[in-house]
A protein has these predicted regions:
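His-Asp-centered metal-binding catalytic motifs of divalent-metal-dependent phosphohydrolases/nucleases
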Residues: 40-60, 77-87
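An active-site-proximal "capping" alpha-helix that borders the catalytic cofactor pocket
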Residues: 27, 32, 56-67
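Divalent metal-dependent phosphate-bond-processing catalytic cores, especially two-metal-ion Mg2+/Mn2+ enzymes
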Residues: 10-38, 50, 88-179
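Short, well-structured alpha-helical segments
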Residues: 5, 21-28, 41, 45, ...
Length: 179
């Protein structure tokens, strides 16, 4: 797995900080945590390391071949990535990977990632809040992901309410900063 991690880390170079290798590591761990019985967990975890790298699919295929991964299995790994990234996964593996990615966009980590990406792209607080609201509403498919998402969504809603309250307070103080 170390070679897979090293390869995945190289694939992430130059990405915005919200989509760096630590994002991939969290997704891989979440895949293990939420995969229901009957899902090939090892396949989904392997697919997690190639999440967001479909533009380099040929390179990923060659890497898997060098590792000795059978072509049929490599195709299933890449199909799970494709399915998850379609936004409407159909396969059990695609649903697990999709859900893990959604979970990483929820809760405290999701808020931190949203502001990190927005700062990187010079977006406003209001634009970041819009993105966070969109993330709160994303669907998850697996039972364990639904349980985990509920708590993370509650936290995000509380955070947004609090942030909106503080921003309104600041605006009501005649344009002066809140002290």
């Amino acid at each position: 797995m170390r070679r897979v991690e090293e390869f995945s880390r190289r694939l992430r170079e130059g990405r915005d900080p919200a989509h760096d290798f630590s994002h991939i590591q969290r997704i891989a761990r979440l895949c293990r945590a939420i995969a229901p019985p009957g899902v090939d967990t090892e396949l989904v975890v392997l697919a997690a390391y190639f999440h967001g790298a479909l533009e380099r699919e040929d390179e990923v295929r060659r890497f898997l071949e060098e590792l000795g991964v059978k072509e049929e299995y490599a195709c299933r790994v890449l199909e799970a990535v494709r399915d998850a990234e379609s936004g409407r996964p159909e396969s059990p593996e695609g649903k697990v990977l999709y859900d893990a990615n959604v979970l990483d966009a929820l809760g405290a980590v999701g808020i931190a990632r949203s502001f990190t990406k927005s700062g990187y792209e010079s977006q406003s607080i209001e634009e970041t809040m819009r993105i966070i609201r969109e993330n709160v509403e994303r669907t998850v498919y697996t039972p364990r992901a639904r349980e985990m998402a509920d708590d993370r969504r509650r936290f995000m809603k509380y955070f947004l309410e609090r942030l909106e309250m503080e921003l309104r307070y600041a605006e009501n103080r005649r344009g002066r900063a809140v002290e």
